[in-house]
Amino acid sequence: MPDFVCKVAATGVTVSLGHQLAKSPKDIEDCIVAGAKAFTHLGNGIPNEVNRHDNIVYTALVEDRASVMFIPDGHHLPDTMLKLYARAVPLKRLVAVSDAQYPAGLPPGEYEVCGAHARLEPNGLLWNPARNCLVGATTPIAKCMRILEERIGLTPDECRAIGHDNALALIDKR
């Protein structure tokens, strides 16, 4: 995997690690050294049960060379996890994303999303009832910022950094 990361990073693409099953923190370390700059959707895209000490979440929280991207939509992560990220990770390394996709902005109902059946609930939860799992997100980034402000206690300036400035810096646009 580090060879692949190195080749992709050499093209100027920002490489982010996520929705993966690294076998060890060493595998993650090798990818960071090879050019990976972030962790995608930290806390999601991993098995429901992971090793309680040796897992990507802990590794990402202490890896100073990579940003931590997360989805603060009120569905993907509990408030306790959002608070942990806000307290454990330096502000400059945090990047909030909405991950909003089809059917964002549409009324509650049944939809086909990336080939999977999905139900969009009135509260914005997009999930597959048969598999009891999330199928994506529909919450706009502005609402994600309100969640971080109102439920986690971040300031408007911190939210702007996490929801805008840090993302631009991550892709070298700031």
Stretch-by-stretch model annotation:
Residues 1-7:
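Active-site core of PLP-dependent enzymes with the aminotransferase class I/II
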Residues 4, 17, 25-158:
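Active-site-adjacent C-terminal substructures of enzyme catalytic domains
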Residues 156-167:
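Short, well-structured alpha-helical segments that form the helix of a local strand-helix-strand
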Residues 169-174:
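Short arginine-rich
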